[in-house]
C-alpha cells in the first residue's frame, strides 16, 4: 500500500493537481493507493473520486486548516497501524510537516516533492520549519534544477 498526502488534487485544476493525479493513477495500476486530499467542492470531488475508485481510494478532508491537517494525521495513523505501508508520498513539505514528527520512528520510506515557489524563504521561522520537515524525509524530488 502507498499513501499519498496532498493539498492539491483533482477535481481542482492545476499543474500540481495533474501531477498528483497521474502519480496516483499509475502507481495504482500495481499497488493499492490511498490519497489523503483536501476537499474543495463536495460534488465535483465526489464525482471525480467515484470515477477513479477502481484505481485508487481518495479520503477527503474539509474544514478549517488546523483541524483538517490533524484529521488527516489521525486517519493516517490508523491506516498505518492496520496495514503494511510501502511508502508515503507528499506533494509538498507542508503536507509532510505534521506527519513527519509522528511517523519518524515507523520505518516507512517517505518521498516529498518540492516546487520552486514553496521553498522561497519568508523568514527564519519559515526556513526552520522547512529544514526540520525535510530532514525527516527519505527522498526529496525537486521539479527543476533551480529548486535543487
Per-region residue spans from a language model:
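Short, well-structured alpha-helical segments in soluble
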Residues: 74-83
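Short His-centered aromatic/hydrophobic patch
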Residues: 90-96
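Structural alpha-helical scaffold elements that stabilize or flank donor/cofactor-binding regions
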Residues: 81, 132-133
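A short, active-site helix/loop in glycosyltransferases that binds the activated sugar's phosphate group
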Residues: 137-148
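Active-site proximal beta-strand in glycosyltransferases
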Residues: 2, 87, 103-120, 141
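A short, histidine- and acid-enriched strand-loop-helix "catalytic/donor-clamping" loop
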Residues: 12, 67, 96-97, 110-125, ...
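Short, well-ordered alpha-helix to beta-strand connector turns
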Residues: 30-31, 85, 137
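N-terminal strand-loop element at the rim of the active site
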Residues: 7-13, 20, 25-68
Amino acid at each position: 500500500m502507498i499513501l499519498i498526502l496532498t493539498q492539491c488534487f483533482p477535481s481542482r485544476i492545476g499543474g500540481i493537481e495533474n501531477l498528483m493525479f497521474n502519480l496516483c493513477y499509475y502507481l495504482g495500476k500495481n499497488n493499492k493507493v490511498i490519497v489523503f486530499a483536501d476537499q474543495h467542492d463536495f460534488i465535483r470531488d465526489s464525482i471525480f473520486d467515484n470515477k477513479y475508485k477502481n484505481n485508487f481510494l481518495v479520503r477527503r478532508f474539509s474544514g478549517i486548516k488546523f483541524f483538517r491537517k490533524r484529521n488527516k494525521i489521525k486517519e493516517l495513523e490508523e491506516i498505518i497501524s492496520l496495514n503494511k505501508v510501502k511508502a508515503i508520498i507528499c506533494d509538498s513539505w507542508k503536507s509532510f510537516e505534521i506527519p513527519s514528527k509522528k511517523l519518524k520512528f515507523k520505518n516507512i520510506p517517505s518521498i516529498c516533492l518540492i516546487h520552486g515557489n514553496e521553498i522561497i524563504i519568508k523568514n527564519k521561522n519559515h526556513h526552520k520549519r522547512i529544514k526540520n520537515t525535510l530532514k525527516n524525509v527519505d527522498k526529496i524530488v525537486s521539479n527543476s534544477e533551480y529548486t535543487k
